[in-house]
Amino acid sequence: MKFIVEREHLLKPLQQVSSPLGGRPTLPILGNLLLQVTEGSLLLTGTDLEMEMVARVALSQPHEPGATTVPARKFFDI
């Protein structure tokens, strides 16, 4: 998976999907965000098992499709 996105386009959606991830999760994976690259967009998903937030960010550069999870706090700090 490979994609390029400007930080300014990513910041607001990242804040939205990170909101249900506050505090220390009971399961470590719940502190991560799911990143999915498909058809010209990046999908960001965050959940605490009770609430799920999904945001879409348009990608203007060519990309390679794929999916992975990343620690939400570290990704947001970058």
From Swiss-Prot:
Alphabetized InterPro entries for the sequence: DNA_clamp_sf (IPR046938), DNA_polIII_beta (IPR001001), DNA_polIII_beta_N (IPR022634)
Short name of any one Pfam family annotated for the protein: DNA_pol3_beta
One GO CC term, this protein: cytoplasm
Family: Belongs to the beta sliding clamp family.
Biological function: Confers DNA tethering and processivity to DNA polymerases and other proteins. Acts as a clamp, forming a ring around DNA (a reaction catalyzed by the clamp-loading complex) which diffuses in an ATP-independent manner freely and bidirectionally along dsDNA. Initially characterized for its ability to contact the catalytic subunit of DNA polymerase III (Pol III), a complex, multichain enzyme responsible for most of the replicative synthesis in bacteria; Pol III exhibits 3'-5' exonuclease proofreading activity.
UniProt subcellular location: Cytoplasm
Lineage of the organism: Bacteria, Pseudomonadati, Pseudomonadota, Gammaproteobacteria, Enterobacterales
Keyword flag DNA-binding: yes
Protein name, UniProt field: Beta sliding clamp
GO biological process: DNA strand elongation involved in DNA replication
Keywords for this protein: Cytoplasm, DNA replication, DNA-binding, DNA-directed DNA polymerase, Nucleotidyltransferase, Transferase
GO molecular function, one term: DNA-directed DNA polymerase activity
Claim: Calcium is one of the keywords in the record: no
Subunit relationships: Forms a ring-shaped head-to-tail homodimer around DNA which binds and tethers DNA polymerases and other proteins to the DNA. The DNA replisome complex has a single clamp-loading complex (3 tau and 1 each of delta, delta', psi and chi subunits) which binds 3 Pol III cores (1 core on the leading strand and 2 on the lagging strand) each with a beta sliding clamp dimer. Additional proteins in the replisome are other copies of gamma, psi and chi, Ssb, DNA helicase and RNA primase.
Superkingdom of origin organism: Bacteria
Species this protein is from: Serratia marcescens
